[in-house]
Amino acid sequence: MTRYILLAQLLVASLVFAQDEIPERLLLTGGQQLGSGARALGLGGTYTGIADDFSAIWWNPAGLAQVKRIEVQGTLLRTGFSNESSYFGLNREGSTDAMRLNNIGVVFPVPVYQGALSFAFGYSQVTDFERRTQVESGQAGQDWDNFDEVESGKLGQWSFATAVDISPNLSVGAGINYWTGSSDYSLLGQYNSTVQTEQSIFTDLGGWNFNLGGLYRPGRMVRIGVATSTPFSMSLNEEWVIDGDDGYFDYKMSYPWIWRMGASVAPGRWMLAGDIEYRDWKSLEFRGDTPYEGVTRAEGNRQIRERYESTTRISLGGEYLFPAYGLRGRLGYSIEPSNFKDAGEDADKGVLSLGFGVLIDRSVMLDATWRTASYTEEVTTGLKEDIRSSQTLLTLSYRM
């Protein structure tokens, strides 16, 4: 359950929730953290030490120096979300899905006398907010009798990046990003046995930051990459409607550092890769007044540090080339820990990825990936959520 307490705190005085606490889940800490491109995600997100197409603009901009021909890339994403919730003993299932653009962009390599120089521009969706929770109480006297909570939206970035070889075996890259996205949340429910409520909140997101990266090639088969996405101040502009009353609130939160390190080795027809990604969620903080009644900036930031923890995602991936068919098969697996301390021992995600890529007429690359994860969250008292999520991606790349 993500955000209903936020709305209830604003206007519904009869609820018993504390007025001096932030919600169980803040918007910026939720959603499915994805990434860019079917090939990268087919390898489990192990792309920091590969990064040899447009999607490097997100994973490791230094890898753009490996692109030797003009490349145009686009990716479609279909997400699925299913949530079997148990609220004090009674089970209900809610599901939702959506289809969106995952990325679109172009890479321009520039002819130089020695080494490589490339520029890239495009869009990458990196977070998906699709979620649904349906609840019916199996025990009399609880705060909620039933509700249907739905959230949809996305968070992505428009980026301009460049990469250059500074030595025969070392590339560096940097990008400037404009983050943009939105979340559309609604809740229909009944509480205290008699009171019906209808609530909605729409949030626009925006901010600027930088991506930095390096890629070292100690030999023909090995690549080692490091990358970071710098922290920045995210603007959140909210418009809410609760049982016919409406209003708005604008505030800012700092988005944390993201650090990545990865390596790949490609002996013959095989390629094996591994990545580590660190997100400093404890550094998330309000930059001014909070939108929650009775919660000061200092108190809100104290509660963030108490409730959230930094995460380290570990991922492994492999790719095998079938030369007779021009086909590459892919397999990936990642462990993605929950950033909420009290989400339960089964809240960490194990994400399995399967994919393939095929070269068409030497210029067009078609990549497809399917990912799935199952996990359990116990964030709200009395509520257990067994969640299954999936993503299907299709990438088309054309090199001139």
List each language-model region with its residue ranges.
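Sec-dependent signal peptide recognition
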Residues: T2-Q9
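Outer-membrane beta-barrel porins/channels
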Residues: Q19-L41, N103-M400
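Short structured motifs
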Residues: W59-N60, R302
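Short, charged, low-hydrophobicity "junction" segments
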Residues: Y4, G44-S55, I304-E306, D342
